[in-house]
Amino acid sequence: MDLHEYPRPANDTGIGVHWTVGFASTIGMGKIRDFWIPELKAMGVKWVKIFNHDGAIDFAELLLAEGLMPVVRIYRPSPYPSAFDLRDVVHIDALIRAGVRYFEFNPEPDQDTEWKGGRVPANAIELAVENIITNLDTILERGGMPAIPAVSNGSRWDLVGKIVARGRKDIFNGPVWHAIHNYSRNRPLDYPYDIGNQEGASYTLRFYQTLADETWGEDAWRGRALHEINKLRLERCNPGATIMDDNACWLAYEFMDARNRRHLGRSIPILSTECGYLVGEDGDARYPATTPDLHMAQTLE
């Protein structure tokens, strides 16, 4: 299926939000219609990911009527190893009748929390791919557009490659897309190509002090002095590094696209179903923890 054949909202901005994981019906369709829909439109949002909880069909119909594209996750706690049950299929059918096309299911199969028993087994990727193929076929047969499940941020799991290796490259002739969770961590948006990672460029005193003075209840530098930060940046720089070396960042979609093209000979659509900056995140010590001001600036960027 060619890219232009995938349905998109009118005047698509590419901007989306992940709705609360709770029940849409908790606050009521009236408040969503009167308050939240105008807020979404004011921000330029065109895509809204929701869960298939009670009220999801009404919510999806409202989004479609307002020119927004719903992406529905079929929620199943600790779903692996298993495929959709009858209840899931009935709900998928109802959502498709309501106009929903994009479906997501069972993300991050590389994480313990997604497996019954709470642990990823040794042959997890093989078991997961078996279930994923079954679910993809189920949604495709009903006229839906399923996602290859997202793996966790920075994971090297190659689900597309495994599906192709099982002789099911034909699945990608249909309207399949790829979900990703390209969380930025506390790294800049152009990581790994930023000057800090490539050359170990030093922070200025002005930048350091601006973040140090921000009042938010935590220390952006985690007690490290400027000279300590700059020493760390120089020692841990990675000249020539590309996204293929480290994809735990915003640009993870470039990594996924390169692998997909290698396996399929072409790109397939990639939609980020979880991403962004998290206040307080500090996984890479070469960069400041994400403060509220940094969160705002980098999100707007």
Question: What is each stretch, according to the model?
Answer:
Residues M1-D54:
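Boundary/entry segment of secreted carbohydrate-active catalytic domains
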Residues D2-D12, G16-H18, V72-A128:
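Ligand-binding grooves and catalytic loops that recognize ribose/phosphate and carbohydrate rings
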Residues G22-T26, D110-D112, S184-R187:
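Short acidic, S/G/P-rich loop/turn micro-motifs used as interaction or catalytic elements
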Residues M43-G44, E66-G67, A98-G99, R142:
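Short, structured coil segments at secondary-structure junctions
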Residues F51, N106, H181:
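Conserved residues at the C-terminal ends of beta-strands
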Residues A56-D93, A122-M296, L300:
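Noncatalytic carbohydrate-binding groove/subsite architecture in carbohydrate-active enzymes
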